[in-house]
Amino acid sequence: MSIDYKKLWPEALDFESLDQNAQHVDPKDEDFDYAEAFQELDLEEVKQDIESVMTDSQEWWPADYGHYGPLFIRMAWHSAGTYRTTDGRGGASGGYQRLPPVDSWPDNANLDKARRVLWPVKQKYGQNLSWADLIVLAGNVALESMGFETFGFAGGREDDFAPDESVDWGPEEEMEASDRYDEAGELPEPLGATVMGLIYVNPEGPDGEPDLEGSAANIRESFGRMAMNDEETVALIAGGHTFGKVHGADDPDEHVGGPPADAPIDLQGLGWENDFGEGKGPDTITSGIEGPWNTTPTQWDMSYIDNLLDYEWWPEKGPGGAWQWTTESGELDAAAPSVDGSSEKEDVMMLTTDVALKRDPDYREVLERFQENPDEFQEAFAKAWYKLIHRDMGPPERFLGPEVPEETLIWQDPLPDADYDSIGDEEVAELKEALLDSELSVAQLVKTAWASASTYRDSDKRGGANGARIRLEPQRSWEVNEPAALADALETYEAIQEEFNSARSDAVRVSLADLIVLGGNAAVEQAAADAGYDVTVPFEPGRTDATPEQTDVESFEALKPKADGFRNYLSDEAERKPEELLVDKADLLNLTPPEMTVLVGGMRALGATYQDTDRGVFTDEPGTLTNDFFVNILDMDYEWEPVSEDREVFELRDRETGEVEWEGTRFDLIFGSDSRLRAISEVYGADDGEAEFVEDFVDTWSKVMKLDRFDLE
C-alpha cells in the first residue's frame, strides 16, 4: 500500500488539481469530439426512450406511483445543485454524481438506483450521450411527462472519469457534520452547502432541529451561493416539491447500510441496502423523513403552494425518527395515494425547509404572489430550473441541440454579434506597431491583457478576454487591476481603436477585446526579441465588446480574485496560504504544474506585477523575456530571510556580503522550496533552458488568452 503523503506531510503543496488537467483518464479516444457526437443524436427519440423507462417500473426498485419522474427530478437537481458561484465549481458537467465522493453523499441516497434505471438509455446511445447530459435531460423529460412545460435543454456536458480533486467540499471528516462555520457564524467561501454531504441545507432544520427562522436563513445563504435570488429559490423549492415524496419508513440508522463507496462488492455499486420490510416501495428509507407534499405527486399543479399556505403546520417526529410537519388537525392525513397503488393512503407532510418559506416574510410574499398568479409561478420555475441545470455550462456557444432557447439570459454573460469584418494579418501588424509605439510599456501591455483574460474560470467557463469586460464595472474597479492605472491604459487602447476604425473605408473593425489581447501578444514578442528570440504569438481575432446591459455586476463580482500569484497580488481577504491560492488560480485556468511555473517566471521577467512592485522580479532587465527568475531562485549564493512575522515577504541576500539583492513573496519562493516546482524550475534555469522557457511561455500565454474562445471550437 502506498503512503498517503498528504497525511504524512500536511504542509506540502498539493498538485492533484493541476495534475488532473494533464491526465487523460477518459477511456474514449483523445480525438473524440463529444459536441459533434451529441449533435448526431435524434433528441426526440432519446426523450421517448427516457419516457419509456420512466413508466416501466422495475421489480428490483419499483417506481413510486408507477412513475420514476420524481426520482429523476431529484437526480437532476442534485447533480446540478452542487454548483457554487464563488469558484464556479460543482454542477452537472462531468457527471460527478456517479463518482465518489458525491455518489455516496447521504443527500444522494438511492439515486444510484435512478441511474441504473436509466442505464438502458445510456447503453443504447453510448458515447453520443454523456451521463452528465442524460441525468439532466431525464429531469427535464420527467417534468414534461408530468404536465410541466420546460424552458429548454442544452447538451454539451462531457463526462469525467475521476473525481474532481479541485473541489473543497468542506473541512468535516464525517457525513452530515457541520463544522464549517467560522467564529462569527459565517459560512466560509467557497462552500455553498451548509452541511457535509448535503446539497444545500438540512431538511429537518439547522442541526436537525425544526428551527424555521434558522432554516430560512440557511436556505437564503445556500441558494444565494448558487446564484439564486429569493424568487428563484421559492420557485425551485415549490416546483420541485410539487412532485414525489420523501422516504423514511423507519429509522435509517437501524436498517440502512453504507453508501456505494462502502457497499459490499456483490451489490455491484449499489448502496444503502435496506433490511426494513421489503427494503423498497412503501418500505423505502432514504432521508428518514416520510411522506408526499400533496395528493397529486405525479402531476404539475398548485397543490404544494396551496397546501403550504392554506393549512397550519406543526412539527412532529415521523416514523423514520426525523422532524417533519403535519397539518394542525390532520386534514391531510391519509389523503395521498400509496406508492405501490394499494388502498392504503399516506399522510401529506412538509419539511422544516418548506414551512420556513411560509414563516420568512420575504419568501412568503413570493409564495402568495405565485398562489395568486399560477402562470407567473410556472414561468418562474421554468426559468429557475433552466438556470439550475445549465449554470455551469458557460456562454451560449457551448449550448447544443434543437431545444436551446432563442433567448439568451443575463446569467449566461451574453456577447453581441460582430456587425463588421475582423482584422486580418495586415491589420494585425499595423495595430501591433501602433501599440508598441504608444506610451504603454511592455509591462502595462502584458498586465492589461492578463487582467482581461485571466478572469476565466474553467470550472464554469465564465470570464475571459472576450467581451472586454475589464473596461466595465465591476472589473475596472477591482483592486487587483489597479483602477487608476487601468483607466489610463484603457484610454490609450480606446484612442488606438478609434483612430484605426475611423480611418477604415471598408467594413473591417477592431474590437477593444481583440486589441487588448493583441497588445499583450505584441509585448511578449518584443520582450522575446530583446532577449534574442524571434517568436510570433498566435492570434485569432473575433472577440466582441460586451455592453453594460449585457453584464450583471453582482454576478461578475464573484470572479474577483482575492489573490493572483501570477501578478504577485495578495489581498487582505485571502484566507489561505499564497502558494495554495496560486495553485487554485492555476487550476481555474486549466493549467498544469509546468504551465503554471513558466507563466510565473515569464510574468516576473516582463515586470508584470501588481503596482509594478519589484518583488519577484529577479532580473536586471525587466521587460526582457529571460529565464533570470529561475536562474536566481535556484542560485545557492543567495539565502532568503523573512522580513515579517507572517513570513509572506522575504529578502534575498548574498550569503557572503549580506547585501539585499531582491525581495520576493511566497508566490516566488515556492518555486525553489517545493520539490516538484524546483524540478521544473531547474529545466528552465539551466544554461540551455532559456530557449525552452521562451517557447513554453509563448505557448502557455497564448493558451490563457484564448481559454474562452469557444467560438473557435
Swiss-Prot record:
Q: Which Pfam families match?
A: peroxidase
Mind telling me which CDD domains this protein's record contains?
Answer: catalase_peroxidase_2 (cd08200)
Cross-link Tryptophyl-tyrosyl-methioninium (Trp-Tyr) (with M-226): located at?
Answer: 77-200
Q: Where is the active site?
A: 78 (proton acceptor)
This protein's record includes keyword Mitochondrion: no
Mind listing the UniProt keywords for this protein, alphabetically?
Heme, Hydrogen peroxide, Iron, Metal-binding, Oxidoreductase, Peroxidase
- GO CC annotations, alphabetized: cytosol
The note on cofactor binding and number reads: Binds 1 heme b (iron(II)-protoporphyrin IX) group per dimer.
Catalytic activity of the protein: H2O2 + AH2 = A + 2 H2O; 2 H2O2 = O2 + 2 H2O
Q: How is it modified after translation?
A: Formation of the three residue Trp-Tyr-Met cross-link is important for the catalase, but not the peroxidase activity of the enzyme.
Q: Where is this cross-link: Tryptophyl-tyrosyl-methioninium (Tyr-Met) (with W-77)?
A: 200-226
Write down the required cofactor(s). heme b
According to its UniProt record, this protein's enzyme class is oxidoreductase
Q: State which Enzyme Commission number(s) the record gives.
A: 1.11.1.21
| Residues of the site described as Transition state stabilizer | 74
Does this UniProt record's set of keywords contain Iron? yes
Give me any GO biological process, just one.
Answer: hydrogen peroxide catabolic process
| Molecular functions per Gene Ontology | catalase activity; heme binding; metal ion binding
Binding residues for heme b, per the UniProt record?
Answer: 241
The protein's matches in InterPro entries, at most eight in alphabetical order, are given as: Catalase_peroxidase, Haem_peroxidase, Haem_peroxidase_sf, Peroxidases_AS, Peroxidases_heam-ligand_BS
Described function: Bifunctional enzyme with both catalase and broad-spectrum peroxidase activity.
Q: Which family does it belong to?
A: Belongs to the peroxidase family. Peroxidase/catalase subfamily.
Subunit info here reads:
Homodimer or homotetramer.
Protein name stated in the entry: Catalase-peroxidase
**Species of the source:** Natronomonas pharaonis (strain ATCC 35678 / DSM 2160 / CIP 103997 / JCM 8858 / NBRC 14720 / NCIMB 2260 / Gabara)
